[in-house]
């Protein structure tokens, strides 16, 4: 998928190696010599407007022609002696030669991008011999000569499709505010970074920066005394006089270049002296005396940067304010004061700290109304204060102007660690915790004086309306009136108060606030201090569902560019997803800090017991006279009792809570003969520490309902836990408790291609095509990758397809990897139904923009590092990293795809295991044997790659950071390295090309370094006209890799660290990816929270079926699927199943038991066939030779492999026994005559109820408890010789022929014994034997298919 601009073959040519690069030109100017007298020719593109104004640089064709003629020499870029030899691949703009004799101003307009903030810092456009010219007359703003419209864009095939790139050039205002805090440009575009409720919230100090015209020019220096409104002026001037300010700058500076306020201002040098701003501008001009040579260093830099600026930016990035404001210090202290007030509150100057006496008023009210026991107005109005921040030192985020450029390479907001310290938590006298944000929150409660007066009036009215008034009421009224008058007299504007007075005022208010809390009846245990008659017009301390909320009233914060005005625990993200915020965790760069969390705001109601006999009923709203802490204790006690006192008639009473007593786990069911005593539960300790109960997900018929909390699924944060008043996100979805544990597992029929409606073909590869499809029954929109079995088997790529299927199947647990939805097969094709990623890929983005600025590139680089690390953690080396394989999701984030060349390996990571038995010591010199490796659980291998200090066979230390195994789960084979020469030549590491010494996952980091280079400069570091030339250049990388100009030291250090020897490359070694994440270029990047950031580019989609960002799409007619079905019908029928005798039992015949308790596998009777080792020991079906066993997905949840056969055909009521058992290693088959279950655990099985409880991992699978008085009649058979045979799981599963049924789409021919589909309520043999599994099956099924070592 490539986007390019219109090309003129007669005027501009491109190097052969840059066929995907874009060139901007004006055909009208180049081809029409009669219309070149006008020096203000403007390129217009009416069909595709990117912005209203845009800078451009004029290059004279006459001057260019003279420079080319003076150069001489061989200009062939293929000639090594030519000066173009080393620069042809790094230039996408070739200055054309004009053979016209007309010397008029025939100009080439190259639309430039304002992404690069300081182009002139390295003298990139500086002419060494050009004299300095000073403009004497200013250019009128009515005719700016350099403002041009963007070029007209077409597809490579000439089809005009301006809509196709509309998403690439849309300004991502949310990311702009993230990097530069330019809030005034973001409030009109539904951006969640601006959470203010005020209509004036779009006013910020960044308007000043937008009005300072920072223009880059070469030889003209003009100092203008243009007066820029300083921050102590009225804010409305900045909001209404944008064009006036801009025009005044243009008129005074003598430059006819207009800069739109929508874009960042480029490279100015500005300083504020009092109220006057001096703007220094430089103007580049090219005249007849300029001697800039195309092949000189200056000319090369000019060409390179003209190329990088030839397309509009991703988003306007404002520059640093190092000259405008240095660490928030103005030369004028009054200006600094007013600027702080203006920036943080967005109110008129002098109305910020006028409401500081309200706390004193309420303090007096709370101290004089101690004997009123009404449950009316139970609220302390002014404890929490306002969440708006008036002092930048207390801000939870540092502003861009408060950071040095060295300390934060990005223009993003970073967390202020000092503002997150524990001194923000105030401890009362009885140990209660009250959250306060800053002293400024305490100081400012309301927006203006009128709000104070209205509230005080309402308080006096409410006080007079109280039913139980006494003498203290009148006293409190008088004191309120006095305090109100004092507050009105003491209200002063910020302009009249000095900094010292404000600090003293804040300290005093903080003392009053603390005294108010200590004297408040809500905090102390004194029964006489029940402040239930607080004079407030709003009663926010109410009781809902029996759970008292915090007495702290949370006011809506003042308009602030950073903080959300919503006083709940829920905040809004830019992608409109709800995320719970944890105050004890450092926020990410784009977090909006909500107000402090409510105390104990979770109420749990047990709907299973309608009759609540608890004397401490929390729903009684007449107990407001008691202390709030006592109410909380009662709430905890009542919840504990409700958790313990379940219905005695419940047939499935399985209480396995670790926080409850053992005795409470005993079910008091008289009809239940099976009491499950969990010996691993801990007793409750009675101590003075008050614990808040965790929210347990009860899966009984009457579950516990969580109320008073906003609980939505968002990302990997699904459930809410409360611990010490902190909202803590729950673990990842893979470790969460299933919500349908006691529900019957649904058996989904196998999926085939006829279940989908193919909509459009969106891609085509070497093995097949990719279609956009919709599932007919569920409406799921997926991308189906259809691959030909004939091609796969002929090219011996079966193992590659297996690896791709395994990685995609685990993608649901990794947000950086495209996840698999379905996988199935027929006789002709393999199908992978993946999630549809509609944003295209990074190659399309680079083709449209040609290059990225460092700030935008940093975002994509960080996400690419996370994606590659996720692949390595799964135990795979990608080996084919390129921009085409990084897809852009609908929310703008990156996902890694196309794992067709991935190699299943075990990378050198630290083994993070909680069990010491499963940990391999990598520091000792003793070799790790294969037997020790086999002791590792499959889940560790799958999700936590292992680290080896020696080869698996004990022959010595490894020569690489990756050990490759022939089968991903077969760890008993000897470790070896990868030797295949695969990948794209532009991004291929030298060790892959040599392929004699082997390589590991460090080759992926080399590929990332090459892509980072291409992000900045538009071309890969190693280029050539043919793959052979590219490979030769890669092998000579030490001499061919040169540092271009215009790249920062931090970025080049990162690139050179990745494009390096494998032994010293970043990402290799003991620390691995941590060395990359800790690099100075990624300072300030919130690793682990990148999805909270707003990406630079978000696709503009018109619907779920939008394929705008995919090229060469093809709509499918209605007969396409019918034709495919007819082709399948013409195939020869599958092989018939082997003959079966009628008297043959339906249970497998067990061979003699070996001394090692392992059964010799009968290959003659096997329904499967192993392929050779070169195909990865793939298992296929005998009946269908090209059917790959284990390919069908999903398997773990929806389509069971094995069933727990506790019930037989005569017992169909017990449907809870159909749960899939996972993570098993061995299979124990018990004969029919056995009425006891042999378990390694300590579970109690009474009255032959066949409760298969695995207690090895302290997990009680109590879903299989049959709570009735009827014993299983099938288990009451004759008790004769009990025989137990232990079979390896791979052999046992193959012997039972289960996978041959489930993994071949459950075809009738696959079931050898019956010829029919195995019913879900019984085992495939339906003979009544008891199958007990001790460990779970791995997510990747190939671990059980490893060839047995006999």
Swiss-Prot record:
Residues 756-1082 form the Protein kinase domain. The active site is at residue 880. Residues 127-140, 181-210, 223-235, 270-293, 337-391, 483-495, 525-551, 612-637, 645-679, 690-701, 1204-1219, 1232-1283, 1300-1313 have a biased composition (Low complexity). It comes from the Eukaryota. Keywords: ATP-binding, Kinase, Nucleotide-binding, Phosphoprotein, Serine/threonine-protein kinase, Transferase. Gene3D superfamilies: Phosphorylase Kinase, domain 1 (3.30.200.20), Transferase(Phosphotransferase) domain 1 (1.10.510.10). One of its GO terms (cellular component) is microtubule organizing center. Residues 236-246, 454-482 have a biased composition (Acidic residues). Residues 1131-1142 have a biased composition (Pro residues). Pfam families: Pkinase. PROSITE patterns: AGC_KINASE_CTER, PROTEIN_KINASE_ATP, PROTEIN_KINASE_DOM, PROTEIN_KINASE_ST. One of its GO terms (molecular function) is ATP binding. Belongs to the protein kinase superfamily. AGC Ser/Thr protein kinase family. This is Probable serine/threonine-protein kinase DDB_G0278845. It comes from Dictyostelium discoideum.
């Amino acid at each position: 998928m490539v986007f390019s601009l219109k090309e003129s073959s007669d005027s501009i040519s491109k190097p052969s190696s840059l066929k995907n690069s874009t060139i901007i030109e004006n055909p009208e100017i180049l081809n029409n010599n009669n219309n070149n007298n006008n020096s203000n020719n403007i390129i217009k593109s009416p069909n595709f407007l990117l912005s209203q104004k845009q800078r451009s640089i004029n290059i004279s064709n006459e001057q260019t022609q003279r420079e080319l003629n003076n150069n001489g020499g061989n200009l062939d870029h293929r000639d090594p002696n030519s000066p173009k030899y080393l620069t042809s691949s790094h230039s996408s703009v070739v200055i054309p030669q004009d053979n016209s004799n007309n010397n008029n101003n025939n100009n080439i307009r190259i639309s430039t991008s304002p992404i690069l903030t300081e182009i002139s810092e390295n003298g990139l456009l500086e002419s060494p011999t050009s004299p300095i010219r000073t403009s004497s007359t200013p250019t009128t703003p009515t005719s700016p000569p350099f403002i041009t419209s963007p070029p007209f864009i077409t597809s490579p095939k000439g089809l005009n499709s301006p809509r196709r790139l509309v998403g690439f050039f849309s300004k991502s205002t949310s990311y702009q505010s993230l990097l530069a805090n330019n809030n005034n440009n973001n409030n009109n575009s539904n951006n969640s970074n601006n959470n203010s409720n005020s209509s004036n919230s779009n006013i910020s100090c960044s308007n000043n920066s937008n009005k300072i015209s920072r223009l880059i020019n070469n030889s003209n220096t003009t100092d203008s005394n243009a007066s820029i409104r300083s921050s102590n002026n009225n804010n409305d001037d900045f909001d209404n006089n944008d064009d006036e300010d801009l025009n005044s700058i243009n008129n005074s500076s003598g430059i006819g270049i207009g800069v739109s306020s929508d874009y960042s201002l480029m490279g100015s040098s500005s300083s504020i002296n009092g109220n006057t701003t001096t703007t220094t501008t430089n103007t580049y001009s090219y005249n007849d005396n300029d001697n800039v040579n195309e092949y000189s260093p200056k000319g090369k830099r000019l060409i390179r940067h003209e190329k990088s600026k030839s397309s509009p930016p991703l988003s306007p990035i404002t520059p640093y304010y190092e000259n405008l404001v240095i660490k928030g210090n103005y030369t004028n202290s009054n200006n600094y004061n007013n600027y702080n007030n203006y920036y943080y509150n967005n109110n008129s100057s002098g109305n910020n700290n006028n409401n500081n006496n309200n706390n004193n008023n309420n303090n007096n009210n709370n101290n004089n109304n101690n004997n009123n026991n009404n449950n009316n107005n139970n609220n302390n109005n002014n404890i929490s204060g306002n969440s708006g921040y008036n002092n930048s030192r207390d801000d939870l985020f540092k502003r861009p102007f408060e950071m040095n450029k060295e300390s934060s390479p990005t223009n993003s907001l970073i967390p202020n660690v000092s503002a997150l310290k524990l001194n923000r938590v105030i401890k009362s006298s009885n140990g209660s915790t009250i959250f306060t944000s800053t002293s400024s929150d305490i100081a400012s409660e309301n927006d203006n004086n009128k709000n104070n007066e209205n509230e005080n009036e309402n308080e006096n009215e409410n006080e007079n309306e109280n039913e139980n008034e006494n003498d203290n009421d009148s006293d409190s009224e008088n004191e309120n009136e006095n305090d109100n008058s004092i507050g009105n007299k003491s209200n002063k504007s910020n302009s009249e108060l000095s900094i010292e007075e404000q600090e003293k005022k804040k300290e005093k208010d903080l003392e009053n606030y603390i005294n108010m809390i200590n004297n408040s009846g809500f905090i102390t245990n004194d029964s006489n201090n029940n402040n239930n008659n607080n004079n407030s017009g709003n009663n926010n301390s109410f009781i809902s569902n029996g759970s008292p909320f915090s007495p702290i009233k949370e006011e809506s914060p003042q308009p602030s560019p950073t903080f959300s005005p919503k006083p709940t625990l829920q905040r809004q993200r830019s992608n409109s997803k709800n995320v719970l915020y944890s105050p004890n965790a450092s926020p990410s760069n784009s977090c909006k800090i909500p107000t402090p969390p409510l105390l104990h705001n979770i109420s749990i109601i047990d709907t299973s017991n309608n009759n609540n006999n608890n004397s401490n009923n929390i729903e009684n709203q007449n107990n407001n006279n008691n202390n709030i802490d006592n109410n909380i204790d009662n709430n905890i006690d009542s919840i504990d009792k409700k958790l313990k006192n379940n219905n005695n008639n419940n047939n499935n009473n399985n209480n396995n809570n670790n926080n409850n007593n053992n005795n409470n786990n005993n079910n008091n069911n008289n009809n239940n003969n099976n009491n499950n005593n969990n010996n691993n539960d801990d007793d409750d300790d009675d101590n003075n520490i008050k614990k808040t109960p965790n929210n347990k997900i009860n899966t009984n018929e009457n579950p516990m309902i969580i109320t008073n909390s906003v609980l939505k699924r968002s990302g990997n944060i699904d459930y809410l836990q409360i611990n010490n008043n902190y909202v803590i996100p729950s673990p990842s979805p893979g470790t969460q408790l299933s919500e349908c544990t006691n529900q019957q597992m649904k058996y989904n029929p196998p999926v085939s291609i006829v279940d989908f409606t193919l909509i459009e073909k969106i891609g085509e590869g070497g093995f097949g095509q990719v279609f956009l499809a919709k599932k007919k029954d569920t409406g799921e929109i997926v991308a189906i990758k259809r691959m030909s079995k004939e091609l796969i088997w002929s090219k011996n790529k079966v193992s590659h397809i297996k690896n791709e299927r395994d990685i995609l199947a685990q993608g649901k647990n990794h947000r950086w990897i495209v996840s698999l939805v379905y996988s199935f097969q027929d006789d002709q094709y393999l199908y992978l139904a993946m999630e549809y990623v509609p944003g295209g890929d990074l190659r399309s983005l680079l083709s449209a923009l040609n290059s990225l600025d460092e700030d935008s590139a940093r975002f994509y680089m960080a996400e690419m590092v996370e994606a590659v690390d996720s692949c390595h953690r799964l135990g795979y080396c990608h080996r084919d990293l390129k921009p085409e394989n990084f897809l852009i999701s609908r929310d703008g984030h990156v996902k890694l795809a196309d794992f067709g060349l991935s190699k299943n390996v075990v990378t050198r990571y630290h083994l993070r295991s909680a069990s010491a038995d499963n940990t391999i010591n990598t520091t000792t010199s003793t070799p790790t044997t294969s037997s020790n490796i086999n002791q590792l659980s499959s889940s560790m291998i799958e999700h936590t790659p292992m680290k080896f200090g020696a080869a698996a066979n004990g022959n010595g230390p490894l020569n690489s950071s990756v050990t490759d195994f022939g089968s991903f789960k077969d760890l008993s084979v000897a470790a070896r390295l990868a030797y295949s020469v695969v990948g794209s030549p532009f991004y291929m590491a030298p060790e892959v090309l040599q392929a004699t010494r082997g390589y590991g996952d460090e080759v992926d980091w080399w590929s990332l370094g090459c892509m980072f280079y291409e992000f900045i400069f538009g071309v890969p570091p190693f280029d050539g006209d043919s793959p052979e030339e590219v490979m030769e250049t890669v092998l000579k990388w030490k001499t061919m890799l040169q540092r271009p100009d215009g790249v920062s030291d931090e970025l080049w250090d990162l690139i050179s660290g990745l494009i390096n020897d494998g032994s010293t490359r970043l990402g290799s070694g003991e620390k691995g990816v941590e060395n990359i994440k800790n690099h100075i270029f990624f300072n300030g990047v919130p690793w682990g929270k990148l999805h909270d950031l707003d990406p630079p580019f978000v696709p503009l989609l018109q619907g779920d079926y939008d394929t705008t960002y995919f090229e060469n799409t093809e709509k499918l007619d209605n007969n396409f699927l019918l034709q495919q079905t007819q082709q399948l019908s013409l195939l020869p029928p599958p092989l018939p199943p082997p003959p079966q005798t009628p008297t043959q039992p339906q249970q497998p015949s067990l061979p003699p038991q070996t001394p090692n308790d392992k059964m010799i596998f009968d290959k003659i009777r096997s329904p499967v066939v192993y392929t050779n080792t070169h195909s990865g020991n793939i298992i296929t079906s005998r009946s269908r030779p090209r059917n790959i066993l284990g390919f069908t997905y999903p398997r773990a949840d929806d389509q069971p492999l094995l069933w727990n056969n506790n019930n037989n055909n005569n017992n169909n009521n017990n449907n809870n026994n159909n749960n899939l058992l996972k993570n098993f290693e061995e299979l124990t088959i018990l004969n029919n005559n056995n009425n006891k279950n042999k378990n390694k655990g300590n579970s109690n099985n009474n009255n032959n109820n066949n409760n298969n409880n695995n207690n090895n991992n302290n997990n009680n699978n109590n879903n299989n408890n049959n709570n009735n008085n009827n014993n299983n009649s099938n288990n009451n058979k004759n008790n004769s010789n009990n025989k137990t045979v232990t079979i390896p799981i791979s052999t046992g599963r193959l012997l039972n022929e289960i996978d041959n049924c489930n993994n071949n789409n459950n075809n009738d021919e696959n079931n050898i014994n019956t010829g029919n589909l195995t019913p879900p309520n019984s085992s495939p043999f339906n003979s009544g034997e008891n199958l007990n599994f001790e460990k779970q099956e791995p997510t990747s099924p190939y671990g059980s298919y490893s060839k047995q070592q006999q």
